[in-house]
Structure formats: structure tokens, C-alpha cells
């Protein structure tokens, strides 16, 4: 998902797992409609909070600012949700976490606290933490925008590997090369609406939207 700041990309992601409540329209997760209703004040709210909690476990989210628990080690961050939300036995959760930390290339830092990691390392821990819940889909909200330029590549490599495994991922990003090479579909938002939508080869080489052409040329220049 591409678009200028304020175009609605992050809001869209946050509506999928109801971190923000949509005011109109419908949200389906894996074909299942999230049921909504109006409360007594006329606000749109979930009809069944248990449904929302269940569906949230199917969506892993990786944030721009990592959102790791600072008082926990890397390993503790990764096992926290499986143990306390999914009731996975601790020894089983640790075994899976160790495997995931190897996968994202940060197993040697498993006993470190986040403050002692670089931004790229913290974001790879955040990806491992999201994967630990075995979600059907991963949501990435500008996962590299808070990183120093030299650290971006290590995170994109992990994300590319996940895409090659066939994982369903919705990625909000300004990394044009990554979007072009890795995605199966590109959506460009403008002022909350879809301005361009299609396969990357088509969108990047022959866009129908003049706004997207301007957006793309501006980012390629930088």
C-alpha cells in the first residue's frame, strides 16, 4: 500500500484489526464479516468483542516504532502472547521462539533487552513476535520508516523471505523498489480513496493515475 502521508494507509490497516473503528463500510477477515452495531450514542462499535479478539489472533501486526516491551528480553517478548493469549505451554513457546529468532537472524541477541539493540534488530524481533502467534496475515505499518538507512536492508530481507514463503502480507511502505519486486498487488491511496490498484508491473510501468505518476517520480528522485 502506497500513498502520501495522511492518505489513509495506516488507518486502513488499523481498521482491519479494529485498533480504529470504521465508521462505514464492511470489514471481512478471511471471508468472515466483522459484525458492527451502533451504540446508544450512535457510535459504531463491535457487536461481539469475542469475535474481534478471535480475529485479532489471526492478524499479526508490525508497527513503525517496534512496540517491544522494554522490560522484557528478546525471547520474553516473543513468547509473551503465545503463552498468555493462546495458552501455549511455555517450553513449547520457547522452542518456537528460538526457531523464529534464528529465522530473522537475531537468535544471538535472545537474552538482550530492546534498549541494547539497533532499530533494525528491534524490528526483526517485532516480526518474530508477530510470527509467534501463527497469524493468517501479517500487517506491516511502515516497518522501515523509523530506521537509519543502513538498517533498512536487513528488515526488507526478512520481509522478502516471508513473501517468498507465500505468506499473506499487507505492507504500508515508501520503499518503491521493494513494492515493485516483492508485491503481487499494489494499491495507491489518495485522500482515503483508492487511486490506483493492480499488479506491480502494470502500476509502475503504465499507471492510469496522474497523481501516482507524480508520487512515484518524487520518491524515485529521493
What are these regions (language model features)?
Residues 25-40:
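Conserved ABC transporter NBD signature motif
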Residues 113-117, 121:
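Conserved ABC ATPase signature
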Residues 132-136:
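A short, proline-enriched helix->beta-strand linker immediately N-terminal to the Walker B motif
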Residues 138-141:
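Catalytic Walker B motif of ABC-type/P-loop ATPase nucleotide-binding domains
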Residues 149-151:
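Helix N-cap at the start of a conserved alpha-helix in ABC-type nucleotide-binding domains
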Residues 197-198:
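ABC ATPase "signature
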